[in-house]
Amino acid sequence: MTDKLIIFDTTLRDGEQSPGASMTRDEKLRIARQLERLRVDVIEAGFAASSNGDFESVQAIARAVKDSTVCSLARANDRDIARAAEALKEANRARIHTFIATSALHMEKKLRMTPEQVLEQARQAVRFARNLVEDIEFSPEDGYRSDPDFLCRVIETVIAEGATTINVPDTVGYAIPELYGNFIKNLRERIPNSDKAIWSVHCHNDLGMAVANSLAGVKIGGARQVECTINGLGERAGNCSLEEVVMAVKTRRDYFGLDVGIDTQHIVAASRMVSQTTGFVVQPNKAVVGANAFAHASGIHQDGVLKARDTYEIMRAEDVGWSANKIVLGKLSGRNAFKQRLQELGVQLESEGEINVAFAKFKELADRKSEIFDEDILALVSDESVTSEKEQFGFVSLAQHSETGERPEATIVFTVDGKEVRSSAEGNGPVDASMKAIEAHVRSGAEMVLYSVNAISGSTESQGEVTVRLQSAGRVVNGVGADPDIVVASAKAYLSALNKLQSKAERVAAQG
């Protein structure tokens, strides 16, 4: 009988720490539902004590998710742990993930605590958490760079206090696969009660080895949980990629001898949803979910695949959710067909009202574009105006005038707290003019640090997906907008970023 590998997804917590990847509550809820559809074992929904916004997100996900365990991060103190437990109280299965740094560098420079103080705080934190929920995960932050003798003492102590999962993170992505695997193995062999907990790995990708290190922790170290994110999203160079580690274990079951419960046919839908929500475009050559992952340009490769797919393909594209028939709907498609396709794509809107709004936008798009692709639909439902979440700024219409040799002018109509306003401005181009028209009224003072355009599908009538990254007062957010008209898409993206900037400011104010 094979062991099961537990998949712990932290897209909504650690993934959101990517600069600009800030998500609203409703966006997190949609992704959580997709993760549940993917059959992720544990969803780390956020850090409940960090802000009122994060608390509400964790609480909403705990209420909505029925099959996956819902987890909240908490520092090793009573306030954080109690706040996490409160946010999780309506979850079918709840987990508190508490942590404290154990490396000499972190204890001295960041915590300013002695090892004995850290040991005692870890003990008290797990004891307190165990009285609130049964499922407790403990992480020694910067565990891989910690003194092994001290780490053994800490882990033995927290297991004795009731920790059910021990996660050993490579917090800064410093590890090498063989060394990391043996590090986990040695800890498990040295700690007398190590068999009383499930061992977990959490690897960052600073040296490009997050997946390799995680797999070494499983194969060599005996870990049975991997912490990962969709598309490898995460701060700095990112985290271990869920799709890569899952497909590695499934494709090389002969080597790993493990089962995973993931429904892999929903992987691509999850990847697209996270990409379009955060504005982080998946690189074409990304393993499993990149546009070129199953493409063969070489004539020799193409000939081999046509004769026998397994000559050059080690897994089937359809097994991870790639569809051979990419054209799905048109202007004659009805509401039921649209609703069914949403379900097939893993999209679950909150209410019939939201479906009606989304369908109206679909019909509007179908009148302008003859072929509607899956990517078009996902971009459409990612639009903030589809969801019930309150938005301060909303796009209404845009008119532009541009002639060779003259400065373009744009006039935009948009809503501010539900009231329509009209603003005009000139710019160096129509996109610049439209954004200056918005700023002429809003006066946010935000600095644009990124502007990018991505064609959603391959034709000339494709929707353009625009990502705008704004920075203000130390806050960085991404806004995403899609439309066949690039200027309109740009205006939508700018307004989306302003909404997130406002939301993040409110969360910071609430936290303060």
From Swiss-Prot:
Protein name: 2-isopropylmalate synthase
UniProt-recorded Gene Ontology molecular function terms: 2-isopropylmalate synthase activity; acetyl-CoA C-acetyltransferase activity; manganese ion binding
Metabolic or biological pathway, per its Swiss-Prot or TrEMBL entry: Amino-acid biosynthesis; L-leucine biosynthesis; L-leucine from 3-methyl-2-oxobutanoate: step 1/4
Annotated Gene Ontology cellular component terms: cytosol
Gene: leuA
Obligatory cofactor(s): Mn(2+)
UniProtKB keywords: Amino-acid biosynthesis, Branched-chain amino acid biosynthesis, Cytoplasm, Leucine biosynthesis, Manganese, Metal-binding, Transferase
Positions contributing to Mn(2+) binding: D14, H202, H204, N239
InterPro entries: 2-IPM_HCS-like, 2-isopropylmalate_synth_dimer, AIPM/Hcit_synth_CS, Aldolase_TIM, LeuA/HCS_post-cat, LeuA_allosteric_dom_sf, LeuA_bact_synth, PYR_CT
Organism: Acidovorax ebreus (strain TPSY)
Main subcellular location: cytoplasm
SMART domains in the cross-refs: LeuA_dimer
GO biological process: L-leucine biosynthetic process
